[in-house]
Protein backbone atom coordinates (compact mmCIF):
# COMPACT_ATOMS: atom_id res chain seq x y z
CA UNK A 1 0.00 0.00 0.00
CA UNK A 2 1.55 3.28 -1.13
CA UNK A 3 1.58 6.09 1.45
CA UNK A 4 2.53 9.75 1.26
CA UNK A 5 2.02 12.77 3.49
CA UNK A 6 1.06 15.07 0.62
CA UNK A 7 -1.09 14.49 -2.41
CA UNK A 8 1.05 13.43 -5.34
CA UNK A 9 1.91 16.44 -7.51
CA UNK A 10 2.18 14.16 -10.56
CA UNK A 11 -1.52 13.35 -10.48
CA UNK A 12 -3.39 12.92 -13.75
CA UNK A 13 -4.59 16.29 -15.01
CA UNK A 14 -7.30 17.56 -17.34
CA UNK A 15 -7.22 21.16 -18.53
CA UNK A 16 -4.68 21.91 -15.80
CA UNK A 17 -6.78 20.34 -13.02
CA UNK A 18 -5.06 17.85 -10.73
CA UNK A 19 -7.31 14.84 -10.27
CA UNK A 20 -7.02 13.20 -6.83
CA UNK A 21 -6.48 9.44 -6.93
CA UNK A 22 -5.61 8.42 -3.37
CA UNK A 23 -7.59 8.45 -0.13
CA UNK A 24 -6.69 10.12 3.16
CA UNK A 25 -6.18 7.95 6.24
CA UNK A 26 -4.39 9.18 9.33
CA UNK A 27 -3.01 12.22 7.53
CA UNK A 28 -1.44 10.12 4.77
CA UNK A 29 -2.47 9.67 1.15
CA UNK A 30 -2.81 5.97 0.48
CA UNK A 31 -3.96 3.43 -2.06
CA UNK A 32 -6.34 0.64 -1.05
CA UNK A 33 -4.56 -2.15 0.78
CA UNK A 34 -5.81 -4.46 -1.97
CA UNK A 35 -4.49 -2.03 -4.62
CA UNK A 36 -7.90 -2.27 -6.32
CA UNK A 37 -9.30 0.86 -7.95
CA UNK A 38 -12.58 2.30 -9.21
CA UNK A 39 -12.94 4.28 -12.41
CA UNK A 40 -14.30 7.81 -12.13
CA UNK A 41 -16.19 9.12 -15.16
CA UNK A 42 -17.12 12.38 -16.83
CA UNK A 43 -20.91 12.05 -17.25
CA UNK A 44 -20.95 14.62 -20.07
CA UNK A 45 -18.87 12.32 -22.28
CA UNK A 46 -18.86 8.91 -20.61
CA UNK A 47 -15.05 9.01 -20.66
CA UNK A 48 -12.87 7.92 -17.74
CA UNK A 49 -11.40 10.85 -15.79
CA UNK A 50 -9.18 8.96 -13.36
CA UNK A 51 -9.38 6.16 -10.83
CA UNK A 52 -9.55 6.14 -7.03
CA UNK A 53 -8.92 3.41 -4.46
CA UNK A 54 -11.61 0.76 -4.11
CA UNK A 55 -11.45 0.76 -0.32
CA UNK A 56 -12.78 -2.19 1.65
CA UNK A 57 -12.90 -3.53 5.20
CA UNK A 58 -9.15 -3.23 5.84
CA UNK A 59 -9.06 0.38 4.71
CA UNK A 60 -12.14 1.26 6.76
CA UNK A 61 -10.58 -0.37 9.81
CA UNK A 62 -7.45 1.73 9.36
CA UNK A 63 -9.47 4.92 8.94
CA UNK A 64 -11.66 4.30 11.99
CA UNK A 65 -8.67 3.37 14.14
CA UNK A 66 -7.00 6.61 13.07
CA UNK A 67 -10.12 8.63 13.88
CA UNK A 68 -10.49 6.89 17.25
CA UNK A 69 -6.85 7.54 18.17
CA UNK A 70 -7.10 11.21 17.21
CA UNK A 71 -10.32 11.54 19.21
CA UNK A 72 -8.35 10.60 22.35
CA UNK A 73 -5.22 12.57 21.48
CA UNK A 74 -4.29 15.77 23.28
CA UNK A 75 -3.89 17.47 19.89
CA UNK A 76 -7.63 17.16 19.31
CA UNK A 77 -9.26 16.38 22.65
CA UNK A 78 -7.57 19.29 24.44
CA UNK A 79 -7.86 21.71 21.54
CA UNK A 80 -9.77 24.82 22.65
CA UNK A 81 -13.13 25.32 20.93
CA UNK A 82 -11.87 28.61 19.51
CA UNK A 83 -9.07 26.71 17.76
CA UNK A 84 -11.56 24.35 16.12
CA UNK A 85 -13.51 27.41 15.06
CA UNK A 86 -10.41 28.99 13.49
CA UNK A 87 -9.62 25.81 11.54
CA UNK A 88 -13.10 25.67 10.03
CA UNK A 89 -12.98 29.37 9.20
CA UNK A 90 -9.61 28.89 7.49
CA UNK A 91 -11.06 25.97 5.57
CA UNK A 92 -13.90 28.19 4.34
CA UNK A 93 -11.34 30.74 3.17
CA UNK A 94 -9.37 28.02 1.38
CA UNK A 95 -12.48 26.77 -0.41
CA UNK A 96 -13.09 30.24 -1.76
CA UNK A 97 -9.43 30.74 -2.66
CA UNK A 98 -9.54 27.51 -4.69
CA UNK A 99 -13.10 28.08 -5.83
CA UNK A 100 -12.51 27.99 -9.58
CA UNK A 101 -10.53 24.76 -9.32
CA UNK A 102 -13.12 23.07 -7.08
CA UNK A 103 -16.02 24.19 -9.26
CA UNK A 104 -14.41 22.86 -12.45
CA UNK A 105 -13.51 19.61 -10.71
CA UNK A 106 -17.10 19.21 -9.51
CA UNK A 107 -18.57 19.90 -12.92
CA UNK A 108 -16.19 17.45 -14.60
CA UNK A 109 -17.03 14.70 -12.12
CA UNK A 110 -20.71 15.37 -11.38
CA UNK A 111 -21.84 17.07 -14.60
CA UNK A 112 -23.72 19.97 -13.05
CA UNK A 113 -23.56 23.46 -14.51
CA UNK A 114 -20.39 25.34 -13.65
CA UNK A 115 -22.46 28.18 -12.18
CA UNK A 116 -24.14 25.68 -9.82
CA UNK A 117 -20.75 24.32 -8.82
CA UNK A 118 -19.52 27.82 -8.03
CA UNK A 119 -22.64 28.93 -6.16
CA UNK A 120 -23.89 25.76 -4.46
CA UNK A 121 -20.82 23.60 -4.06
CA UNK A 122 -18.15 26.20 -3.29
CA UNK A 123 -20.10 29.27 -2.18
CA UNK A 124 -22.67 27.51 -0.03
CA UNK A 125 -20.04 25.15 1.40
CA UNK A 126 -18.01 28.13 2.62
CA UNK A 127 -21.17 29.64 4.11
CA UNK A 128 -22.00 26.41 5.97
CA UNK A 129 -18.46 26.08 7.29
CA UNK A 130 -18.52 29.61 8.69
CA UNK A 131 -21.90 29.09 10.31
CA UNK A 132 -20.95 25.78 11.91
CA UNK A 133 -17.55 27.11 12.98
CA UNK A 134 -19.37 29.48 15.30
CA UNK A 135 -21.03 26.61 17.13
CA UNK A 136 -17.66 25.33 18.35
CA UNK A 137 -17.58 28.10 20.97
CA UNK A 138 -21.29 28.06 21.79
CA UNK A 139 -21.94 24.57 23.10
CA UNK A 140 -23.61 24.99 26.46
CA UNK A 141 -24.98 22.89 29.28
CA UNK A 142 -27.24 23.84 32.14
CA UNK A 143 -27.25 24.01 35.94
CA UNK A 144 -30.02 22.11 37.67
CA UNK A 145 -31.58 22.05 41.14
CA UNK A 146 -32.10 18.52 42.45
CA UNK A 147 -35.10 17.47 44.53
CA UNK A 148 -34.05 14.18 46.10
CA UNK A 149 -33.78 14.38 49.91
CA UNK A 150 -30.26 14.55 51.32
CA UNK A 151 -28.92 14.52 54.86
CA UNK A 152 -29.17 17.96 56.52
CA UNK A 153 -25.44 18.57 56.30
CA UNK A 154 -25.11 17.58 52.59
CA UNK A 155 -25.72 19.89 49.66
CA UNK A 156 -25.57 19.20 45.93
CA UNK A 157 -24.82 20.88 42.64
CA UNK A 158 -25.82 19.40 39.28
CA UNK A 159 -25.02 20.40 35.73
CA UNK A 160 -25.03 19.06 32.19
CA UNK A 161 -22.41 19.27 29.46
CA UNK A 162 -22.65 18.69 25.71
CA UNK A 163 -19.81 16.38 24.66
CA UNK A 164 -18.79 14.85 21.31
CA UNK A 165 -20.46 11.55 20.37
CA UNK A 166 -17.13 10.15 19.12
CA UNK A 167 -16.14 8.82 15.71
CA UNK A 168 -18.68 9.85 13.07
CA UNK A 169 -19.18 7.90 9.85
CA UNK A 170 -20.38 10.34 7.19
CA UNK A 171 -21.74 8.71 4.03
CA UNK A 172 -22.76 11.14 1.32
CA UNK A 173 -24.50 11.03 -2.08
CA UNK A 174 -23.41 12.10 -5.53
CA UNK A 175 -25.84 14.95 -6.25
CA UNK A 176 -24.06 17.67 -4.21
CA UNK A 177 -20.69 16.04 -3.51
CA UNK A 178 -18.79 18.93 -1.92
CA UNK A 179 -21.74 20.55 -0.18
CA UNK A 180 -22.98 17.26 1.30
CA UNK A 181 -19.50 16.55 2.63
CA UNK A 182 -19.46 19.93 4.36
CA UNK A 183 -23.00 19.43 5.70
CA UNK A 184 -21.66 16.38 7.56
CA UNK A 185 -18.11 17.23 8.56
CA UNK A 186 -18.65 20.87 9.62
CA UNK A 187 -20.99 20.22 12.58
CA UNK A 188 -19.15 17.01 13.46
CA UNK A 189 -15.75 18.71 13.69
CA UNK A 190 -17.14 21.86 15.31
CA UNK A 191 -18.47 19.69 18.14
CA UNK A 192 -15.13 17.95 18.63
CA UNK A 193 -15.83 14.64 16.90
CA UNK A 194 -13.54 12.93 14.42
CA UNK A 195 -14.84 11.81 11.04
CA UNK A 196 -14.49 9.06 8.47
CA UNK A 197 -16.07 10.36 5.27
CA UNK A 198 -17.13 8.03 2.47
CA UNK A 199 -18.10 9.91 -0.68
CA UNK A 200 -20.25 8.34 -3.37
CA UNK A 201 -18.23 6.09 -5.64
CA UNK A 202 -19.36 8.15 -8.66
CA UNK A 203 -18.18 11.52 -7.31
CA UNK A 204 -15.23 11.29 -4.91
CA UNK A 205 -12.94 13.97 -6.31
CA UNK A 206 -14.00 17.14 -4.50
CA UNK A 207 -14.28 15.29 -1.18
CA UNK A 208 -10.64 14.26 -1.54
CA UNK A 209 -9.61 17.81 -2.40
CA UNK A 210 -11.63 19.09 0.57
CA UNK A 211 -9.68 16.77 2.85
CA UNK A 212 -6.39 18.09 1.48
CA UNK A 213 -7.49 21.66 2.15
CA UNK A 214 -8.66 20.70 5.66
CA UNK A 215 -5.14 19.49 6.44
CA UNK A 216 -3.78 22.76 5.08
CA UNK A 217 -6.23 24.63 7.33
CA UNK A 218 -4.64 22.98 10.36
CA UNK A 219 -6.84 19.99 11.07
CA UNK A 220 -4.80 17.36 12.95
CA UNK A 221 -4.02 14.11 11.15
CA UNK A 222 -6.80 11.60 11.70
CA UNK A 223 -9.50 14.13 12.56
CA UNK A 224 -10.84 13.77 9.02
CA UNK A 225 -10.29 10.61 7.00
CA UNK A 226 -11.69 9.94 3.53
CA UNK A 227 -12.23 6.38 2.30
CA UNK A 228 -13.30 5.91 -1.31
CA UNK A 229 -15.06 2.74 -2.36
CA UNK A 230 -18.38 1.07 -2.90
CA UNK A 231 -21.32 1.24 -0.55
CA UNK A 232 -21.72 -2.51 -0.23
CA UNK A 233 -18.11 -2.92 0.91
CA UNK A 234 -16.57 0.26 2.35
CA UNK A 235 -19.91 1.76 3.36
CA UNK A 236 -21.13 -1.41 5.01
CA UNK A 237 -17.88 -1.89 6.93
CA UNK A 238 -18.03 1.69 8.14
CA UNK A 239 -21.61 1.39 9.40
CA UNK A 240 -20.85 -1.85 11.25
CA UNK A 241 -17.51 -0.85 12.80
CA UNK A 242 -17.74 -1.07 16.61
CA UNK A 243 -15.72 2.12 17.16
CA UNK A 244 -18.08 4.26 15.07
CA UNK A 245 -20.44 6.05 17.46
CA UNK A 246 -22.70 7.78 14.94
CA UNK A 247 -23.63 7.36 11.30
CA UNK A 248 -24.78 10.36 9.25
CA UNK A 249 -26.18 9.24 5.90
CA UNK A 250 -27.76 11.00 2.95
CA UNK A 251 -29.03 8.81 0.14
CA UNK A 252 -31.84 6.52 -0.92
CA UNK A 253 -34.55 5.27 1.41
CA UNK A 254 -33.71 1.69 0.44
CA UNK A 255 -30.11 2.02 1.66
CA UNK A 256 -31.21 4.16 4.60
CA UNK A 257 -33.36 1.31 5.90
CA UNK A 258 -30.36 -1.03 5.80
CA UNK A 259 -28.17 1.49 7.62
CA UNK A 260 -30.83 2.31 10.18
CA UNK A 261 -31.38 -1.37 10.90
CA UNK A 262 -27.65 -2.00 11.33
CA UNK A 263 -27.31 0.99 13.66
CA UNK A 264 -30.27 -0.20 15.69
CA UNK A 265 -28.69 -3.59 16.25
CA UNK A 266 -25.39 -2.04 17.37
CA UNK A 267 -27.05 0.85 19.26
CA UNK A 268 -25.31 3.53 17.20
CA UNK A 269 -26.71 7.02 16.88
CA UNK A 270 -27.92 7.63 13.33
CA UNK A 271 -29.36 10.43 11.23
CA UNK A 272 -30.85 9.65 7.83
CA UNK A 273 -31.74 12.16 5.11
CA UNK A 274 -33.45 10.03 2.48
CA UNK A 275 -35.70 10.14 -0.56
CA UNK A 276 -38.44 12.53 -1.54
CA UNK A 277 -41.34 13.05 -3.91
CA UNK A 278 -42.09 16.67 -3.17
CA UNK A 279 -45.45 18.16 -4.16
CA UNK A 280 -45.72 21.62 -5.70
CA UNK A 281 -49.22 23.00 -5.07
CA UNK A 282 -50.48 25.90 -7.22
CA UNK A 283 -53.68 27.57 -6.03
CA UNK A 284 -56.19 29.27 -8.32
CA UNK A 285 -55.11 32.82 -7.49
CA UNK A 286 -51.48 32.28 -8.56
CA UNK A 287 -50.24 33.99 -11.72
CA UNK A 288 -49.86 31.19 -14.33
CA UNK A 289 -46.48 32.41 -15.58
CA UNK A 290 -45.08 32.68 -12.06
CA UNK A 291 -46.45 29.23 -11.33
CA UNK A 292 -44.86 27.74 -14.43
CA UNK A 293 -41.49 29.34 -13.73
CA UNK A 294 -41.59 28.25 -10.10
CA UNK A 295 -42.55 24.69 -10.97
CA UNK A 296 -39.83 24.49 -13.63
CA UNK A 297 -37.20 25.68 -11.18
CA UNK A 298 -38.43 23.21 -8.56
CA UNK A 299 -37.99 20.19 -10.85
CA UNK A 300 -35.19 21.15 -13.24
CA UNK A 301 -32.73 22.66 -10.75
CA UNK A 302 -29.56 20.53 -10.66
CA UNK A 303 -31.07 18.44 -13.48
CA UNK A 304 -33.76 17.15 -11.13
CA UNK A 305 -31.14 15.35 -9.06
CA UNK A 306 -32.33 16.85 -5.77
CA UNK A 307 -33.97 15.02 -2.87
CA UNK A 308 -36.58 17.79 -2.60
CA UNK A 309 -37.15 18.13 -6.36
CA UNK A 310 -40.72 19.25 -7.02
CA UNK A 311 -41.60 16.19 -9.08
CA UNK A 312 -45.37 16.18 -8.37
CA UNK A 313 -47.16 19.30 -9.59
CA UNK A 314 -50.75 19.92 -8.52
CA UNK A 315 -52.45 22.87 -10.24
CA UNK A 316 -55.98 24.13 -9.62
CA UNK A 317 -58.20 23.05 -12.51
CA UNK A 318 -59.12 26.65 -13.39
CA UNK A 319 -55.55 27.46 -14.49
CA UNK A 320 -54.22 23.94 -15.12
CA UNK A 321 -54.05 24.03 -18.94
CA UNK A 322 -52.57 27.53 -18.95
CA UNK A 323 -49.82 26.53 -16.53
CA UNK A 324 -48.79 23.31 -18.28
CA UNK A 325 -48.70 25.04 -21.67
CA UNK A 326 -46.32 27.62 -20.22
CA UNK A 327 -44.32 24.85 -18.58
CA UNK A 328 -43.97 23.08 -21.91
CA UNK A 329 -42.53 26.24 -23.46
CA UNK A 330 -39.98 26.47 -20.64
CA UNK A 331 -39.10 22.78 -20.91
CA UNK A 332 -38.58 22.95 -24.67
CA UNK A 333 -36.36 26.02 -24.31
CA UNK A 334 -33.91 24.37 -21.90
CA UNK A 335 -30.55 23.74 -23.58
CA UNK A 336 -28.98 20.43 -22.57
CA UNK A 337 -25.22 19.92 -22.73
CA UNK A 338 -21.92 19.89 -20.89
CA UNK A 339 -21.94 21.93 -17.70
CA UNK A 340 -18.67 23.54 -18.77
CA UNK A 341 -20.20 25.05 -21.93
CA UNK A 342 -21.67 28.53 -22.20
CA UNK A 343 -25.40 28.80 -22.88
CA UNK A 344 -26.26 25.40 -21.39
CA UNK A 345 -29.15 25.19 -18.91
CA UNK A 346 -29.00 21.55 -17.87
CA UNK A 347 -26.21 18.99 -17.73
CA UNK A 348 -26.17 15.18 -17.71
CA UNK A 349 -27.33 12.56 -15.26
CA UNK A 350 -24.47 11.54 -13.00
CA UNK A 351 -23.86 8.05 -14.39
CA UNK A 352 -24.84 5.56 -17.05
CA UNK A 353 -26.73 3.49 -14.47
CA UNK A 354 -28.74 6.47 -13.25
CA UNK A 355 -29.34 7.66 -16.81
CA UNK A 356 -30.90 4.31 -17.67
CA UNK A 357 -33.00 4.41 -14.50
CA UNK A 358 -34.45 7.84 -15.34
CA UNK A 359 -35.30 6.69 -18.87
CA UNK A 360 -37.08 3.66 -17.38
CA UNK A 361 -39.28 5.97 -15.31
CA UNK A 362 -40.12 8.02 -18.41
CA UNK A 363 -41.15 4.84 -20.21
CA UNK A 364 -43.31 3.94 -17.21
CA UNK A 365 -45.11 7.26 -17.51
CA UNK A 366 -45.87 6.62 -21.16
CA UNK A 367 -47.00 3.04 -20.47
CA UNK A 368 -49.27 4.20 -17.64
CA UNK A 369 -51.16 6.53 -19.98
CA UNK A 370 -49.92 9.96 -18.93
CA UNK A 371 -49.77 12.58 -21.71
CA UNK A 372 -46.19 13.42 -22.70
CA UNK A 373 -46.10 17.22 -23.00
CA UNK A 374 -42.39 17.61 -23.71
CA UNK A 375 -39.17 15.63 -23.51
CA UNK A 376 -39.15 11.85 -23.55
CA UNK A 377 -36.56 9.13 -24.05
CA UNK A 378 -34.89 10.45 -27.21
CA UNK A 379 -31.22 11.26 -26.61
CA UNK A 380 -30.60 15.03 -26.82
CA UNK A 381 -26.82 14.64 -27.28
CA UNK A 382 -24.60 12.26 -29.23
CA UNK A 383 -22.64 11.18 -26.15
CA UNK A 384 -22.92 11.42 -22.39
CA UNK A 385 -25.75 10.62 -19.99
CA UNK A 386 -28.26 13.29 -20.98
CA UNK A 387 -32.04 13.33 -20.54
CA UNK A 388 -34.45 15.87 -21.98
CA UNK A 389 -36.55 17.91 -19.54
CA UNK A 390 -39.71 15.81 -19.46
CA UNK A 391 -43.23 16.84 -18.45
CA UNK A 392 -46.28 14.59 -18.22
CA UNK A 393 -49.89 15.77 -17.90
CA UNK A 394 -52.06 13.54 -15.74
CA UNK A 395 -55.37 15.14 -16.69
CA UNK A 396 -57.45 12.09 -15.78
CA UNK A 397 -55.84 11.83 -12.32
CA UNK A 398 -54.66 8.28 -12.90
CA UNK A 399 -52.78 6.46 -10.16
CA UNK A 400 -49.59 6.23 -12.20
CA UNK A 401 -46.18 5.08 -10.98
CA UNK A 402 -44.63 8.51 -11.47
CA UNK A 403 -46.76 9.80 -8.59
CA UNK A 404 -45.15 7.44 -6.10
CA UNK A 405 -41.68 6.47 -7.34
CA UNK A 406 -38.70 8.78 -6.85
CA UNK A 407 -37.11 9.45 -10.25
CA UNK A 408 -34.28 11.78 -9.18
CA UNK A 409 -34.17 13.36 -12.60
CA UNK A 410 -35.83 16.07 -14.73
CA UNK A 411 -39.22 14.37 -14.91
CA UNK A 412 -42.43 16.10 -13.80
CA UNK A 413 -46.02 14.86 -13.62
CA UNK A 414 -48.72 17.56 -13.46
CA UNK A 415 -52.18 16.75 -12.07
CA UNK A 416 -55.21 19.07 -11.72
CA UNK A 417 -57.20 19.43 -8.49
CA UNK A 418 -60.53 21.01 -7.62
CA UNK A 419 -60.36 21.86 -3.91
CA UNK A 420 -57.94 22.16 -0.98
CA UNK A 421 -59.02 18.96 0.74
CA UNK A 422 -58.34 16.98 -2.43
CA UNK A 423 -54.88 18.39 -3.03
CA UNK A 424 -53.78 18.00 0.60
CA UNK A 425 -54.89 14.37 0.49
CA UNK A 426 -52.99 13.79 -2.76
CA UNK A 427 -49.88 15.55 -1.50
CA UNK A 428 -49.83 13.38 1.63
CA UNK A 429 -50.42 10.08 -0.20
CA UNK A 430 -46.69 9.68 -0.81
CA UNK A 431 -44.60 7.54 1.53
CA UNK A 432 -42.10 10.41 1.47
CA UNK A 433 -42.31 13.64 3.44
CA UNK A 434 -39.20 15.71 2.81
CA UNK A 435 -40.40 18.94 1.23
CA UNK A 436 -43.38 20.69 -0.35
CA UNK A 437 -44.16 24.10 -1.80
CA UNK A 438 -47.33 26.17 -2.04
CA UNK A 439 -47.79 28.89 -4.66
CA UNK A 440 -50.44 31.49 -3.86
CA UNK A 441 -51.06 35.12 -2.92
CA UNK A 442 -53.39 34.01 -0.12
CA UNK A 443 -51.24 33.71 3.00
CA UNK A 444 -54.12 32.39 5.07
CA UNK A 445 -54.67 29.54 2.62
CA UNK A 446 -50.94 28.80 2.52
CA UNK A 447 -50.71 28.58 6.31
CA UNK A 448 -53.76 26.33 6.54
CA UNK A 449 -52.31 23.96 3.94
CA UNK A 450 -48.95 24.07 5.70
CA UNK A 451 -50.62 22.84 8.88
CA UNK A 452 -51.87 19.74 7.06
CA UNK A 453 -48.85 18.78 4.94
CA UNK A 454 -46.69 15.86 6.03
CA UNK A 455 -43.34 17.39 5.08
CA UNK A 456 -40.21 18.38 6.94
CA UNK A 457 -39.94 21.69 5.07
CA UNK A 458 -42.76 23.67 3.47
CA UNK A 459 -41.96 26.59 1.20
CA UNK A 460 -44.40 29.29 0.11
CA UNK A 461 -43.77 30.91 -3.29
CA UNK A 462 -40.30 29.38 -3.46
CA UNK A 463 -38.76 25.90 -3.51
CA UNK A 464 -35.46 24.26 -2.56
CA UNK A 465 -34.44 27.16 -0.32
CA UNK A 466 -32.16 25.92 2.48
CA UNK A 467 -30.04 27.77 5.02
CA UNK A 468 -27.40 26.68 7.56
CA UNK A 469 -29.58 28.02 10.39
CA UNK A 470 -32.75 26.22 9.25
CA UNK A 471 -33.28 22.58 10.33
CA UNK A 472 -33.70 20.24 7.36
CA UNK A 473 -35.01 16.69 7.32
CA UNK A 474 -37.99 14.55 6.56
CA UNK A 475 -41.15 12.93 7.81
CA UNK A 476 -42.14 9.31 7.10
CA UNK A 477 -39.81 7.45 4.69
CA UNK A 478 -37.72 10.58 4.10
CA UNK A 479 -35.62 9.90 7.16
CA UNK A 480 -34.95 10.64 10.80
CA UNK A 481 -33.02 13.48 12.41
CA UNK A 482 -32.24 16.96 11.17
CA UNK A 483 -29.38 18.71 9.41
CA UNK A 484 -28.36 22.33 10.08
CA UNK A 485 -28.86 24.79 12.88
CA UNK A 486 -29.07 23.94 16.54
CA UNK A 487 -30.91 20.74 15.64
CA UNK A 488 -27.80 19.38 13.91
CA UNK A 489 -25.62 20.14 16.91
CA UNK A 490 -27.85 17.93 19.03
CA UNK A 491 -27.12 15.02 16.70
CA UNK A 492 -23.33 15.44 16.93
CA UNK A 493 -23.19 15.77 20.72
CA UNK A 494 -24.53 13.85 23.68
CA UNK A 495 -25.28 14.91 27.25
CA UNK A 496 -23.13 14.18 30.26
CA UNK A 497 -24.67 14.91 33.67
CA UNK A 498 -22.54 15.88 36.67
CA UNK A 499 -23.67 15.73 40.31
CA UNK A 500 -21.50 17.02 43.16
CA UNK A 501 -22.33 16.37 46.78
CA UNK A 502 -20.56 18.58 49.32
From Swiss-Prot:
Q: Which gene encodes it?
A: styD
Could you tell me which InterPro entries the record lists for this protein? Ald_DH/histidinol_DH, Ald_DH_C, Ald_DH_CS_CYS, Ald_DH_CS_GLU, Ald_DH_N, Aldehyde_DH_dom, StyD
Give the E.C. number(s): 1.2.1.39
This chain belongs to which protein, by name? Phenylacetaldehyde dehydrogenase
Q: In which pathway does it act?
A: Aromatic compound metabolism
Q: What role is this protein assigned?
A: Phenylacetaldehyde dehydrogenase that catalyzes the last step in the aerobic styrene degradation pathway by mediating oxidation of phenylacetaldehyde to phenylacetic acid.
Q: Which of the seven top EC classes does this enzyme belong to?
A: oxidoreductase
PROSITE patterns given in the database record: ALDEHYDE_DEHYDR_CYS (PS00070), ALDEHYDE_DEHYDR_GLU (PS00687)
The entry's active site is: 273, 307
Name the positions where NAD(+) binds.
Answer: 251-256
Q: Which GO terms describe its biological process?
A: styrene catabolic process
Q: Which Pfam families match?
A: Aldedh
Q: Which reaction does it catalyse?
A: 2-phenylacetaldehyde + NAD(+) + H2O = 2-phenylacetate + NADH + 2 H(+)
- The scientific name of the source species is Pseudomonas fluorescens
A Gene Ontology molecular-function term? phenylacetaldehyde dehydrogenase (NAD+) activity
| UniProt keyword annotations, A-Z | NAD, Oxidoreductase
Task: Give the record's family classification.
Answer: Belongs to the aldehyde dehydrogenase family.
Amino acid sequence: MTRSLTMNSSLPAIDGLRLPHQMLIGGQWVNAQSDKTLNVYNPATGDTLTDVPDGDVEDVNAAVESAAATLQSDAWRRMPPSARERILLRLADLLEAHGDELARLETLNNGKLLIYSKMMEVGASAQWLRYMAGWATKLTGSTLDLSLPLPPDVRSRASTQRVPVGVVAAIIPWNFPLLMAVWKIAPALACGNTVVLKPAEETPLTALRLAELAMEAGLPAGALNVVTGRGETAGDALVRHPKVAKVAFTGSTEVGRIIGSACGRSLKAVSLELGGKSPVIVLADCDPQEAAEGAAAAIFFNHGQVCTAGSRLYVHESIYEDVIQRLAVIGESIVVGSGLEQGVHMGPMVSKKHHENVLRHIRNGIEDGADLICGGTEAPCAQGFFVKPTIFANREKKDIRLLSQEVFGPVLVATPFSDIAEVVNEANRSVYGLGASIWTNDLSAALRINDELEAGTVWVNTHNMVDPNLPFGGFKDSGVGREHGAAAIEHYTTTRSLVIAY
